[in-house]
Amino acid sequence: MFLQQFGRGLRLHKGKDHLTVLDFVGHSRAEFSYKDRFESLIGRHSRDILTEVKEGFQNAPFGCKIILEEKAKEEIIANIEGYLRSMNKNRIIKEIASYHETFRDSFSLSGFLDYSHIPFHKIYGSMTWGELCKEAGVCDNVSPNASLIKYAVTKKWLATDSYSYFSQLIKFVDCGFLCDTNTFSEYEKRCAVMFYYDLFDKANNYDCIEEMFNDLATDELFIYELKEVLKYLCDRCSAPEKEDNSVYKEWNPLRLHGVYTKAQIQAALGLSTLERKSPSREGVERLKGIKLEAMYVDVIKKREEGSMTAYKDYAMNREFFHWETQNRVREGSREAEAYRKGENNMLLFVRQQAEHPDYKCRMGFVYLGQVTMKSVEGSKPMQIVWHLDTPMSEATYAFASQYKAIG
């Protein structure tokens, strides 16, 4: 029986509000992964799955419980620990060689991931796909820009969930970066700057987009691997993107409910350019020329072993979000008056916490679009309730309401 059937059964029977599932755990083959199964059950989570199993699935979906008998728990923990231990570079290289031997004519990154069940982030753990293929004897050369792909994957793209954005990058790659940048729309220009900050941490590596594209166009191996990576990333996207609802939608490359890194957001909104990277590390950022104000919210501000510390930033429901200003903002201040009068166009970005539980990178922010103030009270900090012009998704509400659930 599939998980979808459980949900369908509950929906079709109005008087049935809960479901009990008994699953029997026995010995399993070494390559079988309980990790994947439990991650599918829990969905978005703030801690690694091994910790969840050991501590009783504290982040199971609201209203759900997962209970394991002690022996079953021991079997599952041993399985996950063994699976994680075995996922080293040498095993991956061996799997690549085996896959190439069998599927020489249709060899691809996506095909290999389906064949081996090795997680994508493990491919770029210590090397790149091209470097691993060379070690496996599949190819002779590696792109001199391989490190750029590794940086983009490990620092940016593992935290990004936006089909529209990755699709635009594929368009750049499909023309081998030999694009006429002079004809780019404002949307395409901003996507190109986002891409620049996916590859580089600092500004001023290139004077213009055309110079960057011309440089990348000379590296065929880079283009080949980048296309493989982007196609896989497109296929794995699950964010329920919608058209932007802000006053900037004519040029804004961000889509409602898409998930983006802070650097991507800053590039998309013009807070960062090729010449200047935004220095902001605060939770609020303004672009006065177009009356834009971006709010970056971590629902869980600090994570310590065995504890959860949250502040009063949380979703009250799918349409209203409770937010605390910075501590310095007091009643009667210039900032407070700007909020009261609605002087700026407020854009809300929310993530569960800063550090990603599975990858060594920062989590991405869900773009919740333009918001308007419903109420304000207090001082230093002020408490503001924002009304979302478009309700957040159920998946976002599940983590964005955590403070309300535990506070």
Question: Which residues are covered by each model-predicted region?
Answer:
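A short, structural micro-pattern
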Residues: 15-18, 342, 365, 378-380
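Charge-dense, extended regions
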Residues: 184-301
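Short, surface-exposed beta-strand/loop "edge" segments at domain boundaries and coil↔beta transitions
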Residues: 102-104, 119-122, 175-181, 203-206, ...
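Acidic, glycine-rich low-complexity segments with interspersed aromatic residues
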Residues: 133-138, 142-153, 157-169, 173-174, ...
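Long, largely alpha-helical accessory region at the distal end of helicase-like NTP-driven motors
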Residues: 34-176
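Compact mixed alphabeta submodule
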Residues: 357-407
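Conserved segment of the helicase C-terminal RecA-like domain
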Residues: 1-40
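Short beta-alpha junction loops
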Residues: 24-29, 352-354, 375
